[in-house]
Amino acid sequence: MPVSQIQSNYYRPESIEEVIALVREANRNGQQVRVCGAAHSQSWAIYTNSVLMQPNVTNLDPPPSTSKELNLVLDKINHVELYDVQHHLVRAGAGVHLGYDPSDVTQTSTLENSLLYLLWHQYQLTVSELGGITHQTLGGFLGTGSAGGSLKYSFHDNIVGIHFVDGEGELRYANRDKDADLFHAVLVSMGLLGVIVEVELQCEPAFNICGQEATVSYQQCAFDFFGESAEKPSLLDFFNDVDYGRINWWPQPGIERLVPWQAQRQAQVVGFTPRPYQEFTAYPQVAEPVISIIYAILGNLDNPIRLYEKVQAGDIAIHKVIENIHDYKQFGVFGDMFRQLVELLTLATSDAFNAFVIANRKTIKEQLPTILAQIVSVFQPLDSDRLGISAGNPQVFQDHAPWGLPMDNEASDEFLDIEFSELWFPVGRSAQVMQMLRDYFDSETDPNKKLDRTGLFMIEVYMAKASQAWLSMGYSDQQDEWRDGAVRFEPLWFVDFAENPAERFYPQFWNLFKESNIPYRLHWGKMLPLLNKRDGQDTMAYIRRQYPKLADFLALRERLDPQQIFVTDYWRDHLQIPAKG
């Protein structure tokens, strides 16, 4: 059976029948099978064992072409068809991207062949809720339990049926009402129960959103982020009041600010004119490449050759900085050094750049809190510090829902290549979680050491509606404290930083809440604990205990995939999947 491939790294089945044939062949040959969507998850979570010798980062190069294992891409299974007009029921191939994916491994993704575009323009329909980006494929977004920011709406509410190929090559169907256990098991299953090939969605009529984003100090914020004020609404009140929301938190010394984004639904009206949201409104067109190079410099002070090589390889767009930054003085004490570093990065050899970094890195490190505060004041100034007609006012926006809800869609994977670990908590603990984080940060009085705790970039804070999916991070049986939904936060880490955040950064957060016996879960597609040390093993054991249906999931997994063709060493170790037989 001919199956097209990309550079021999991926198999690209033309149809569901080809997926079935590939799985049956893998079953006979004892090969692993995994599926890549948009490669937005950690690479070890996506691919077969062939990538385990490569770094575990997002947006990684594909598996080695020498691999005999099967890494599938379902870009050709991307149909979208309305099959029940009255009930807004749609069938969609699992390989269809939610929106345009600029980093699509097949380079076939367009806005016009995306799920949201086709729903909107062909059927005047949409889905209830979306994440911060829509680069993902439908199957990938479901498989990792990803979500946007809402306690009222959930993408899971749109899913009514799932077609998947199990480990023996049988095409199975799970219906939300008729096969509740199977449906809720496969809904968030990380590819461990089979290959999701088609999804049935109950969509809703197209709608718009309107909203605002403020940049404020803790004191200026309209709600009390830490839940300690008797006069202001709480963070939980904010979550409950808005239809959709997110807060970007900058907890670093000298910065301490919040960037709450909020939106409400609006009905479609004739003559509606979108006013799209813009990130980094001070410099919306320039911010990303400049932030990228600044953070790459700050994250590689002890290994400058690594940064130089990335620039020379074209991985970091130094030309964008040269073309767009004309006033280096706005960066304060870092301005002149930044200008010289940019110039040295363009030279044919690394000697001068390395020498300059080595000569100045002690000064940069000592002044890092001041440098960072000045950088953030340039790109994320307080509304009260703005000039002109925007002074003191939040950014106001309105848009069609599929393009307004994913507020980070314009963020470039090239410029802002970010890694995450995302911690989910019962939403009723919102104030407790934020207070614990703040107190942990503030207990370190040395500004430089405090930056080691906060990191150099922002922390995203979202909420999510409860889910019945067995391995959803927001799973609830409606009798537990998760029933009202979840609050979640993710400290952001640049891929271009030299250190490994799974060793250097994220364990402090995992341990803080584990040691206080605060229930939390980790996003399956993002960074999980390393298991080469006892501490990581203990953390993962703690995480597994937060899933009441995990044992049921693993038992069902064994029945659906007895030869364990979907099980990689990564998932075996993290979920404690018993060996075959």
Where in the sequence are the language-model features?
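Noncatalytic alpha-helical scaffold of FAD-dependent oxidoreductases
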Residues: M1-G581
